[in-house]
């Protein structure tokens, strides 16, 4: 019983919280939508009263004749009933439109909250957590139905006003016109069925929620079938049938258990409560018929009571305009609240207020840093100690999987070390506000983003505050060797870098890399003091990559520069080179020192050089 009370209390509190979202829809709109719902709740009762009045007046009007006042009264009652019917039909489109507007405005606000919460965490680890991904999928799952969202939940709750009003007012009129025991019996019977249906919907929604990971896998297959990025491989390797089978299989895995559970969760409560409703409604109807036969009520009262019983009984049903919308919308809103809470707790960990504006002045240090992706995962970095002097260039080399990119992610505070710390000029990097520290970093990763936006934004995103400064954007493009490329595009800086848009252009892998490098150099224009290139030139051949790095080091002389590469021959001009292997530094020094050492660097350098000499591309 205590668990039931807690469940009901939580559901009520959630409903109240989601109703507060109506504030973002605007008082006038919500007031208008509520007025339409009040009319929708009262109009059917008024129509029943009017038609019952027509039925009650027919005998006397027929007896009195066509020219009698009784006949005129019958006509007036008939006109009133017709007018009420027409008004009900005319009000429906406005009622629907008001609900849609409420939905759109609330969902717009929810999308803004999702976006804001997504940027709350300092790093990206929270966005890779399975629980977080399930919550985000719950907030906005395009396959769940016809737009079941917090906005539809708000509109659905407003529509409940008319349903409950019909049930209450019709019950009261039955009590006034006929008998209170009859009103109570019919109202309670309908309420019993309604409670059974609604509780079943709630339990079914909770059961369906447990299939979040399955739905995410289904959606992944769907995206592979429809995405531009995967289209070439999907067709070349003939993956369409396989993906279609997997998509359908995962879709069935997500819905078949729900279909089977529906009989037990929804239909069983309905089957148990329906006999109660049938018994109470049947006894009431028999009582009304006997009263009419004995002259206890008039013909008009009989007509109203019978129609009233039907109207009250309709309350004991599934509400197509609100039940699924409210249930899934509330679950989506609950997921949003949990996501916001987790994001806020991540943000709360950042309490630093140190000024990062001129850092680093002396250097950056990794002190005994250990990190792995996920609890219990094998460490990618193990007890890493590394010093990066300010104003110098450092190359980090190693085979794929050595932990090079992870090192950069920790430096950018996309993740936090599991042990050890990173310091800037002797200050723990966590003492700097994350946004302020990142403004001092210009980092381009190997999987940099290809924005389907104009060249101006693709470069200018390196320093958003300079997006309107075309001179600096041109300067960054020139230094990256990409200005000639941009000058050949149809709209130059305004050309959208995607063939999916009119006058858009598709770049090759090497061309995209030069645009990305210009983005990093733009960050320098915006005040970045640390520049990181994480193999953004992997699509270039060895000679082009080596030439670029030499030119790049000249351009960035005086900056703290970190170059990541698995090609040992391309970074020889760096002031210092460290060799990373299985998450630990095994060698460091200049190119010449490492060759004289004759260790791992020298071995892999000569191995890659020999492959290059024989015409093979070094890995």
Model-derived segments and their meaning:
Residues 239, 305-341, 471:
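Cytosolic ends of transmembrane helices, especially the final helix of ABC transmembrane type-1 domains
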Residues 136, 379, 483-515, 521-536, ...:
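ABC-fold ATPase nucleotide-binding domain signature/coupling loops
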Residues 550, 558, 567-619:
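C-terminal portion of ABC ATPase nucleotide-binding domains
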Residues 1-44, 63-77, 95, 131-169, ...:
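Membrane-integrated ABC transporters
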Residues 23-27, 140-153, 213, 226, ...:
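An intracellular "coupling" helix at the cytosolic face of ABC transporter transmembrane type-1 domains
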Residues 31-94, 164, 168-201, 279-300:
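Transmembrane helix-loop-helix hairpins at lipid-water interfaces of multipass membrane proteins
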Residues 421-423, 456-502, 558:
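ABC ATPase nucleotide-binding domain helical subdomain, centered on the C-loop/LSGGQ "ABC signature"
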